[in-house]
Every structure is written in C-alpha cells, then in structure tokens.
Amino acid sequence: MATAASNPYSILSSSSLVHADSAVMQQGSPFRNPQKLLQSDYLQGVPCNGHPLGHHWVTSLSDANPWSSSLASSPLDQQDIKPGREDLQLGAIIHHRSPHVNHHSPHTNHPNAWGASPAHNSSLTSSGQPINIYSQPSFTVSGMLDHGELTPPLPAGTTQSLHPVLREPNDHVDLGSHHCQDHSDEETPTSDELEQFAKQFKQRRIKLGFTQADVGLALGTLYGNVFSQTTICRFEALQLSFKNMCKLKPLLNKWLEEADSSTGNPTSIDKIAAQGRKRKKRTSIEVSVKGVLETHFLKCPKPAALEITSLADSLQLEKEVVRVWFCNRRQKEKRMTPPGDPQQHEVYSHSVKTDTSCNEL
C-alpha cells in the first residue's frame, strides 16, 4: 500500500487516465459511480451515426503508448471509466475527420465495427491498428457545431479520402457555375465595347437625322416595346446600369442596320416614317435674304399674314420659314434689350417719322 500511495500511477486501470499528446498526467478518481453519470453523457447501446466512438487519448497514439493494451484489456476501464461530454464531442470530430474512414470496409474485422469484442480490439492493437475501448455512440458533428465548438483543420489531401457525403457539396457546383460564367462572358460585351458603341450610335443617329424620341418610337414599332427619349439619352451618356446597357445594345444595333439599309432607297421612305418622326433639316438663309428680312423687321416687327405671304413670294421662301424667322427675331430683341429701354424697332420708327416731318417743313 505504501508503494501504491507513493506512486499513484502504478494502478492505471482503476486510478488514472493519461493524455497521450502531452507530458502532463491527470489523475482521476479511482471509481465513478455509474448511478451518478448523466444519461446524456453515456448512452449505451443506442447508435447515433452508425460508428462507435473511440477515446481520442488512446486512438491518437496507440503504438507509442505502453498502457493502451492494458486499457483495452481491462474490464474496469470499459465499465467504470466513462468519458465526459467534451471527450465524446472531440472524439466525434477526430473519428469523422480521420482519413481512415473510407479505407476500411464496415465489416467485423474493423476495430470500430458493431459487435467487435474488446479482446478482438486489443488483438488488433498489436498489428498497428487504432483501437476503441468504448463501444458507446457519440454526438454527431452537427450536434457539436450547434454548441459552438471548433473543428480541427483537415490535413492536406484528406478531401478525396472522405466519404462523398462528408465532402463539400459545392465542389461540382462551383465547376458548373464557373463553366456557365465563362460561357456567358463570351456573349456579354465589356464596358469599353458599350462605350464605343454608344459613341458610334449617337454619331450615326445624328447623321441620319433622327432624334432620340424617334429612336424610341422606332424600337416600339419594330419590337413592340417603346422606349422613352430619356432612356435613349441615358444610353448615349452611359448613365444606365450595365445590365440594361447590355439589353438595349442589340436592339439599337438592329435599328441602325434597318436605318442604314433604308437610307437612299425610295421604296423604304414610308418604312422610315413609320419608325418615327424624322428630324427636319435646319433652314439656312442667305446673307442677302437675311438683310431684307432685317429691314422689314425694323419697319414692322409684327407683320400681318398678307405681308408675310408677299414677302415670302418676293424672297422665294416658304411662308412658314418667314413667319418663324420673325418670331425668333422678336425673341432675340427682347433678350438683347434691357427692360425699360426702347427697343430698336421703336427707335427706328421714331427716326423715320422725324425725317418725314423735316422733309415736309
């Protein structure tokens, strides 16, 4: 008894448990009363995941630990020394993450198989296989993760040795999505291509004489979806989202092809008119004609309809052109003359009356 008291580690089967990964020995109580164990800590004979759990202190270094065989063959260890909940959870991680899971067939010769006796497990210890001295089931990995425990990292090359169910389900999905993404990138234009197309589209649209509203109406006539002038303007200014720019680009490209093919073809004039209202060209007035109009404006800034008609006939201009010119000239006069000052045509008319009176005298 003196020797046993001086060396409390001599009787291992009934007095202590030794951690195989560290040099510190933790002494336990000689016996633990089975009635004091919680039912959640030790569920004997009820399988949770189909794999009995081995104690991680023994399975980690079964060959290097000289006491592993004595622990496996002792009936007291199997009956009285029970692992705690933390030991069971950590053992479940090591068991599920071990690369030996797929290399051993689930038969009776496996040390973790159901129905394997402790004597058979101890005999496998001498051959170098890890043993499990506890045949009770453990908590699953998912149950462990719910409690916030940490999962040890997998060693390199372990993914292929794992069971297909334990592998990451996103391996094949990532490959498929990557393949689809590469396929979609070939059809999706880049931002530089969109910018270049928007610039070319605006130049060709102006050259053809169509407004942004005309393009929107033409798209509605061709494809049944009318776009507003604001949408076409934002496309040319690159203010739409990248997704909407990609959707609108092929429609505008087809419209350009239709407009280019219709230009110069007399039979397709009605088709162009159906696409939208074509912009009227800006009227250019010669300098001599503009001088005559200025003279008439100083005499009468608001001519009557008969005066506009006779003036248009004398200048060989359209009546609408002459009328619009007088309207624009009056607006220009208002902008140029400060408020309160007499306008130019009033000064001109007053000087004309003065000259007439002087001539009469």
From Swiss-Prot:
<dbReference type="InterPro" id="IPR009057">
    <property type="entry name" value="Homeodomain-like_sf"/>
</dbReference>
<keyword id="KW-0371">Homeobox</keyword>
<dbReference type="InterPro" id="IPR013847">
    <property type="entry name" value="POU"/>
</dbReference>
<dbReference type="GO" id="GO:0006357">
    <property type="term" value="P:regulation of transcription by RNA polymerase II"/>
</dbReference>
<comment type="function">
    <text>Transcriptional activator. Induces neural-specific gene expression to act as a key regulator of neural differentiation.</text>
</comment>
<feature type="region of interest" description="Disordered">
    <location>
        <begin position="333"/>
        <end position="361"/>
    </location>
</feature>
<feature type="compositionally biased region" description="Basic and acidic residues">
    <location>
        <begin position="165"/>
        <end position="183"/>
    </location>
</feature>
<keyword id="KW-0217">Developmental protein</keyword>
<dbReference type="Pfam" id="PF00157">
    <property type="entry name" value="Pou"/>
</dbReference>
<feature type="region of interest" description="Disordered">
    <location>
        <begin position="150"/>
        <end position="189"/>
    </location>
</feature>
<dbReference type="InterPro" id="IPR016362">
    <property type="entry name" value="TF_POU_3"/>
</dbReference>
<dbReference type="InterPro" id="IPR050255">
    <property type="entry name" value="POU_domain_TF"/>
</dbReference>
<dbReference type="InterPro" id="IPR001356">
    <property type="entry name" value="HD"/>
</dbReference>
<feature type="region of interest" description="Disordered">
    <location>
        <begin position="100"/>
        <end position="131"/>
    </location>
</feature>
<dbReference type="GO" id="GO:0007420">
    <property type="term" value="P:brain development"/>
</dbReference>
<feature type="domain" description="POU-specific">
    <location>
        <begin position="186"/>
        <end position="260"/>
    </location>
</feature>
<dbReference type="GO" id="GO:0000978">
    <property type="term" value="F:RNA polymerase II cis-regulatory region sequence-specific DNA binding"/>
</dbReference>
<protein>
    <recommendedName>
        <fullName>POU domain, class 3, transcription factor 4-A</fullName>
    </recommendedName>
</protein>
<dbReference type="GO" id="GO:0005634">
    <property type="term" value="C:nucleus"/>
</dbReference>
<comment type="similarity">
    <text>Belongs to the POU transcription factor family. Class-3 subfamily.</text>
</comment>
<feature type="DNA-binding region" description="Homeobox">
    <location>
        <begin position="278"/>
        <end position="337"/>
    </location>
</feature>
<keyword id="KW-0238">DNA-binding</keyword>
<keyword id="KW-0010">Activator</keyword>
<dbReference type="InterPro" id="IPR010982">
    <property type="entry name" value="Lambda_DNA-bd_dom_sf"/>
</dbReference>
<dbReference type="GO" id="GO:0000981">
    <property type="term" value="F:DNA-binding transcription factor activity, RNA polymerase II-specific"/>
</dbReference>
<keyword id="KW-0805">Transcription regulation</keyword>
<keyword id="KW-0539">Nucleus</keyword>
<dbReference type="InterPro" id="IPR017970">
    <property type="entry name" value="Homeobox_CS"/>
</dbReference>
<keyword id="KW-0804">Transcription</keyword>
<feature type="compositionally biased region" description="Polar residues">
    <location>
        <begin position="119"/>
        <end position="131"/>
    </location>
</feature>
<dbReference type="InterPro" id="IPR000327">
    <property type="entry name" value="POU_dom"/>
</dbReference>
<dbReference type="Pfam" id="PF00046">
    <property type="entry name" value="Homeodomain"/>
</dbReference>
